[in-house]
């Protein structure tokens, strides 16, 4: 692969990471609202099917986008391939010799160690993508602790943070570009819940 192709691959990986992180934050906001906001509880009880579809859709998106990022299949461009190609092309990363005093082999080794440190979480992610999501109708919605058995939201956060670190360290050393996750539509959920609550309140007043 050329440097241009690697840069394009990095951008695609980060776009997937942004989707996963934004959906995780929206899911987190929903779970927090469920615990403290009576308005949300009221809306949830009135439209349980809608919210179950919404929550399952968020979970599915988070899992699938992360699974693409950590895909190690030969024809996939994931974090592992990004590390391997970077390892094979040390001359692309001259900045690490001149500016930071870190040898290329040490820089790549650090990223490989970081990647290997989350092996069990990566394996569980793949397992869920391949098997569990086909039966997500059986799962409880708005679970603040875990998504599926043995796989927690803390694991999701760790996978996102690790991917973010590896992608950006390679991108910065290759091009000087740092990618920042931009929050998208994060406030929409509050507006949706408040408007739904107002609508139900007005209907109740009319019925009475």
Label every PLM stretch briefly:
Residues 1-121, 146-208:
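Amphipathic alpha-helical interface segments
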Residues 115-143:
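Histidine-centered, metal-coordinating catalytic motifs and their short helical/loop contexts
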């Amino acid at each position: 692969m050329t440097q241009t192709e690697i840069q394009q691959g990095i951008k695609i990986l980060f776009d997937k990471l942004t989707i996963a992180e934004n959906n995780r934050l929206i899911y987190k906001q929903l779970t927090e609202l469920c615990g403290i906001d009576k308005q949300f509880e009221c809306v949830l009880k009135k439209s349980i099917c809608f919210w179950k579809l919404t929550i399952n859709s968020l979970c599915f998106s988070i899992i699938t986008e992360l699974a693409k990022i950590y895909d190690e299949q030969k024809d996939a461009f994931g974090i592992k391939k990004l590390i391997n190609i970077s390892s094979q092309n040390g001359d692309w990363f001259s900045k690490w010799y001149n500016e930071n005093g870190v040898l290329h082999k040490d820089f790549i080794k650090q990223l490989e160690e970081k990647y290997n440190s989350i092996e069990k979480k990566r394996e569980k992610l793949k397992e869920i993508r391949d098997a569990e999501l086909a039966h997500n109708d059986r799962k409880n919605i708005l679970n603040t602790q875990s998504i599926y058995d043995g796989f927690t939201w803390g694991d999701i956060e760790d996978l996102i943070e690790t991917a973010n670190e590896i992608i950006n360290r390679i991108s910065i050393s290759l091009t000087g570009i740092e990618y920042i996750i931009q929050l998208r539509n994060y406030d929409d959920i509050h507006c949706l819940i408040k408007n739904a609550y107002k609508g139900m309140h007005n209907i109740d007043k009319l019925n009475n």
